[in-house]
Design a protein with these regions (language model features):
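Non-catalytic cap/lid and distal C-terminal segments of serine-dependent acyl enzymes
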Residues: 1-115
Length: 115
């Protein structure tokens, strides 16, 4: 649920949070309510960054449909892919600390480093 609270933090406090690293975002909570929330509360593009990823195994395999909808919301809000937001599908990864540990460098580089 860390990804969902990170989205909320950027949307509610855009002057405090400049980005969110959303790893294995559990979009299905509330039957996609978070997508509706994002659509109505996303901050203006250009000053904020969002990173999303999801695997293809275990519960992560349920996220792609939701993530594609989130990508449309970001694009329609004026966010530029690979600049303001990045979404990565990671084959063979599951919803686990081991999988996240293997890829934690990707959101860190995108959000605070040179991607």
């Amino acid at each position: 649920m860390g990804a969902l609270i990170s989205i909320y933090a950027v949307c509610e406090y855009p002057d405090v949070f400049g980005g969110a690293g959303c790893v294995s975002t559990h979009w299905p909570v509330g039957e996609g309510y978070v997508l509706q929330y994002l659509q109505h509360h996303i901050p203006a593009p250009g000053e904020h960054k969002f990173y999303f990823d999801y695997g293809t195994e275990t519960v992560d395999s349920l996220y792609e449909t939701f993530q594609l909808k989130a990508d449309v919301i970001l694009r329609e809000a004026g966010y530029t892919e690979s600049v303001d937001w990045l979404t990565i599908k990671i084959e063979g990864h599951e919803h686990s600390e081991r999988a996240w540990r293997e890829r934690v460098h990707i959101p860190l580089e995108f959000l605070i480093g040179q991607y």
